[in-house]
């Protein structure tokens, strides 16, 4: 059917094989490309920049107000627009690779009744920003409100440097585990019919399809943020975790 086929068989990462291969797993985790490099390190970098340079100080979240929400929403929207927009422009507007690595040779539909406005991209973009980024921002601002009002334990990064560095990298493991569990849950038939089917309309996904979900699924998806109600916390953790989920 003209679908792209990889040159070689795609296998499981060595961390997920049996019998265990600890040496191969460690090599994969720290290799390039591997588990941390390049993408998870990229999310760490974006998250740290977002908190330390693109966010108000923690105390600003103590009195929840619309301005704080809109600042966070604007920053998150900028990240999403830049990230997905770059892939969309390069691969779907310029079509720089044409069909060379495209699994499905068709392009996203712009005449389909199953999508809002009859257009897959407009449908996906609307769900991404109106629901996805809004709920992402809600979890972020909510957790930071708890932290700024001393309802959860906030650490000093300099005084707890080892813990800070460890958590910055371990949050990806939590995010991946949470995604696996949530994904299994939303394939439970009632939840699938109610919410997850919206995501699965994208049988020919594009860059904007990743966050094109029903609001109920977004609530499940971004609930990875709730971990920080229970563990010693630094604001950078929540930003990195949600950047990992959102991008």
Regions found by a protein language model. Give the residues of each.
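Non-catalytic, topology-defining segments of multipass membrane proteins
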Residues: 1-181, 202-223
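Membrane-interface helix/loop boundary segments of multi-pass membrane proteins
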Residues: 184-200
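Short, small-residue-rich loop/turn micro-motifs
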Residues: 199-202, 244
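Hydrophobic transmembrane alpha-helices
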Residues: 208-247
């Amino acid at each position: 059917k003209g679908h792209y086929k990889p040159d070689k068989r795609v296998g499981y990462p060595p961390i997920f094989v049996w019998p265990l291969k600890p040496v191969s797993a460690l090599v994969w985790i720290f290799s390039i490309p591997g588990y941390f490099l390049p993408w998870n390190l990229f999310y760490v970098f974006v998250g740290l920049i977002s908190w330390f340079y693109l966010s108000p100080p923690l105390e600003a979240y103590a009195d929840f107000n619309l301005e704080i929400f809109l600042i966070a929403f604007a920053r998150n929207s900028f990240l999403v627009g830049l990230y997905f927009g770059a892939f969309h422009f390069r691969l779907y507007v310029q079509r720089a690779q044409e069909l060379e690595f495209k699994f499905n040779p068709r392009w996203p539909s712009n005449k389909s009744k199953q999508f809002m406005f009859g257009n897959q991209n407009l449908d996906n973009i609307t769900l991404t920003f109106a629901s996805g980024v809004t709920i992402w921002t809600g979890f972020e601002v909510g957790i930071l409100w708890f932290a700024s009002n001393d309802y959860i334990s906030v650490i000093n990064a300099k005084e707890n440097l080892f813990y800070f560095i460890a958590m910055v990298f371990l949050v990806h493991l939590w995010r991946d585990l949470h995604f696996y569990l949530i994904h299994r849950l939303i394939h439970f038939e009632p939840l699938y019919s109610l919410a997850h089917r919206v995501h699965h309309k994208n049988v020919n996904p594009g860059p904007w399809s990743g966050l094109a979900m029903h609001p109920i699924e977004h609530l499940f998806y971004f609930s990875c943020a709730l971990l920080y109600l229970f563990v010693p916390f630094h604001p950078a953790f929540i930003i990195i975790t949600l950047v990992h989920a959102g991008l």
